[in-house]
Amino acid sequence: LMLSTAGQEIIEQNNPLKDIFSKYLFGSLMLWLCSFMSLLVFYLFTSWMPTILKTVGFDLQQLSLMSTLFPFGGVIGAIIMCRFMDRLNPTKVITFSYFSAFLLFILLSFTHNNIALFSILIFMIGGLLAGAQTALFPLATLFYPPSCRGSGVSWMHGISRIGAILGSLLGSLIFTLKLDLSSIFLSLAIPTFIAFLCLALKWYRELNIAKQKFKVVRTD
């Protein structure tokens, strides 16, 4: 930004990181942590699900079905999510998706003996997780102003990649701990709930800020 004062030029350099870590710090942390947890769950589930299911007795046909249903659900979920984001509050839509995925993971831990219900839940979780993750980056572009949008989204992308790498590595820990299938799905519910909580807190904060601005306008 260039300003002129009494014939003198004063140049103020735009500092995107300064804005991110001051005015947009809380929202940034919530978005980054949410994306980190989201990709951690997604890559842990997709990378290790066939191996985990094979160790508990699923046959090859069932493994092929599960491996197909999860990404197919993700494609459908992403399309549906985009439709809802255009019509409703985007933060509200994604928050609801993570909370629904959290509940389905809990339900999944009790229904893995029922192949039909288990398959439906796998499809739905794939849709909710992949759809929410796909919608997170458009949400971030709405959150940041143009002056720091590129930096904010890039930081979010980098941090989420760390979650993806960690998720791919955590499968070996699961085998080391020798967790049963119910415990594995319950453990996946924990980071999913954290992702939901991050967006819920961001949404709550934005509502409070909007209410305060409305009160100021009414007072004026």
Question: Which sequence ranges carry the predicted segments?
Answer:
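Helix-to-loop junctions at the C-terminal end of transmembrane segments
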Residues: 78-89
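A membrane-interface helix-boundary motif in multi-pass transporters
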Residues: 175-191
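Intracellular cytosolic loops and amphipathic helices of Major Facilitator Superfamily
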Residues: 1-27, 211-220
